C-alpha cells in the first residue's frame, strides 16, 4: 500500500499504532511511580510464592511422607498474602494476583496497559520465587514443589468450578473491604483478605490445591515443567474474579455518582468532532495520577487536529484500587 493510500485509509489521525497513539496509551509508563508499582508487584509475588509454597513441602520425602497439614498451609498462604498487601498495598495497590488485576481492568480501576505490566511482573516474580525455593530445598523432599493439581477423582470441569468459586469469594472480599464508599469498615483490610485466602485453602486444598491465583500456579509449573490441567488455574480464577468484581461494582454496590459522570463523559464524547478522542481520568491521588489507572473524575479530551487539550473536571470521592 502506498503512503498516499495509507494516509487516506487512516485519515488525519494516522494508523492506530502511530508513535503518538502509543505515547498516549502508555503515558504513565514513563513515570517513577509507575515503575515503583510494577517492581512492588514483582517483589510481593516473589516473597509470597517463596514463603507460602514453601509450606507445602513434605519433609518426610517420597519414601516416608508426612500427613498434609491443611491448617498450616492455609494459615501460611493467608498470612503471607495479608503481609504482602500490608507492605505493598500503598505502593501498587497490592494486587499480587493476575485474576485480581483483570477484575480491576473490567471495573475500570486500572487500564489495560497497566495490567499488562502488572501481570508480567507477577508471573516473573512467581517464577523466581519458585526457583529460589527449589534451590534451597533438598532434592529428596522437593516433590512437586507445590504444583497445583486436580484431585484424581475429579474432572477438569470440577476443578474449574472449584477455582471459580474460591476466587469469586476472594475477589468479592477484596472489593467489599476496599470500597471507599463504606464507613463501617474499621478493621484491617489486609487481614480480611488474608482470612479469605485461608478459607479458600481450607476448603479446596484437596480438590485443586486451592490456587485462586494464576501466577501462584504458574511459577512452580515453570520450574517443575508440570503443565497438567494448568489452564484451569488461569481460566477459573479469572472468570471468578471478573464475576465478583462486576457483581459488586455494578449490581450490589453501584456508584451512582460514577454512573452520572460516565454518562456525561460519553455524552461529551459524542459531541466531539472527527479526529478527537476522549479518555476518562481522575486527579484524586498524586501517587496514582502519574500512572495508567483509568479514573472517572476528569474528562480529558485531546483534539489531534489542533494539538491542544481541554479538561472538564468534576469532584469525586476516592475509588480505591487496592488489591
From Swiss-Prot:
Detected in cerebellum. Detected on pericapillary astrocyte endfeet in cerebellum, and in skeletal muscle. Detected in glial lamellae in the hypothalamus (at protein level). Abundant in mature brain cortex, cerebellum and spinal cord. Highly expressed in the ependymal cell lining the aqueductal system and over the space of the brain in contact with the subarachnoid space. Detected in paraventricular and supraoptic nuclei, the granule cell layer of the dentate gyrus and the Purkinje cell layer in the cerebellum. Only weakly detectable in eye, kidney, intestine, and lung. A motif (NPA 1) lies at residues 97-99. The modification Phosphothreonine is found at residue 289. Residues 58-69, 137-155, 206-208, 223-231 are extracellular. Phosphorylation by PKC at Ser-180 promotes internalization from the cell membrane, reducing the conductance by 50%. Phosphorylation by PKG at Ser-111 in response to glutamate increases conductance by 40%. The keyword Disulfide bond does not apply. It is found in: Cell membrane; Basolateral cell membrane; Endosome membrane; Cell membrane, Sarcolemma. Keywords: Cell membrane, Cell projection, Endosome, Glycoprotein, Lipoprotein, Membrane, Palmitate, Phosphoprotein, Repeat, Transmembrane, Transmembrane helix, Transport. Homotetramer. The tetramers can form oligomeric arrays in membranes. The size of the oligomers differs between tissues and is smaller in skeletal muscle than in brain. Interaction between AQP4 oligomeric arrays in close-by cells can contribute to cell-cell adhesion. Part of a complex containing MLC1, TRPV4, HEPACAM and ATP1B1. This is Aquaporin-4. It comes from Rattus norvegicus (Rat).
